[in-house]
């Protein structure tokens, strides 16, 4: 059979929008929309740094992106989930892995 039509969907976290940027300069608006698309592309059940290949919840993204994201989205549910992921992966000695919820040990 021949494929007659194909539709792609952009999936991301359903966080409510709490802020927006718009100005009289079209270039600034385009830059804002590009950055917002990148943030939404990396904001699912975990925060990633490159949605086309990275699927692990590297926790530094939660720290590095929080200020940028909180002015645009309500992150309360996402960050509650991230904190729960951190708690559930915490080791007996108190160490929190750099990846949560899936703990990966890289050998090499």
Where are these regions (language model features)?
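Substrate-binding groove/exosite segments of carbohydrate-active enzymes
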Residues: 2-108
């Amino acid at each position: 059979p021949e494929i007659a039509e194909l539709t792609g969907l952009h999936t991301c976290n359903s966080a409510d929008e709490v802020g927006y940027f718009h100005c009289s300069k079209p270039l600034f608006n385009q830059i804002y929309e590009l950055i917002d698309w990148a943030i939404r592309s990396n904001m699912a059940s975990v925060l990633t740094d490159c949605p086309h290949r990275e699927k692990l919840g590297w926790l530094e993204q939660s720290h590095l992106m929080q200020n940028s994201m909180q002015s645009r989205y309500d992150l309360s549910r996402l960050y509650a989930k991230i904190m729960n992921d951190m708690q559930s992966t915490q080791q007996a000695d108190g160490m929190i892995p750099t990846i949560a919820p899936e703990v990966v040990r890289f050998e090499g």
